[in-house]
Swiss-Prot record:
InterPro entries: ApaG-like, ApaG_domain, ApaG_sf, Uncharacterised_ApaG. SUPFAM superfamilies: ApaG-like (SSF110069). It comes from the Bacteria. PROSITE patterns: APAG. Residues 1-125 form the ApaG domain. This is Protein ApaG. HAMAP family: ApaG.
Length: 125
């Protein structure tokens, strides 16, 4: 778990074998992120930014409004959880990024998401 500006981020990733096709260099991963608002006031997630790196060092940047079609308002002490996915051309890679947030007083701030691994289970024994 990573905490920044009284916000804790927890990440879990999983390889989706049923949607992957290694012979076509297509490896599908799902990741679930839990955002825990430790502040005494509500916060809203406005934007996301991801840097996705495959095992060959090739990178893809993804950015946009909110997450999974939402700009969630996360009340004080509450958690928001969502699941999304990434497709890589290699069986292992990483993701890192940040969220742009706004607090109840209208102050913008950024929550960094440190690097986490995407890998098929047989590679991380």
């Amino acid at each position: 778990m990573f905490t920044s500006s009284k916000v804790a981020i927890q990440v879990q990733s999983v390889y989706i074998e049923s949607q992957s096709s290694p012979e076509e260099q297509r490896y599908v991963f799902a990741y679930t992120i839990t955002i825990h608002n430790l502040n005494k006031h509500a916060i809203r997630l406005l934007r996301r930014y991801w840097l996705i790196t495959n095992a060959q060092g090739n990178t893809t940047e993804v950015q946009g409004e909110g997450v999974v079609g939402e700009q969630p308002l996360i009340e004080a002490g509450s958690r928001y959880r969502y699941t999304s996915g990434a497709v890589l051309e290699t069986p292992m890679g990483t993701m890192e990024g940040h969220y742009e947030m706004i607090d109840a007083q209208g102050r913008l701030f950024q929550i960094d998401i440190p690097v986490f691994r995407l890998a098929i289970p047989t590679l991380i024994n």
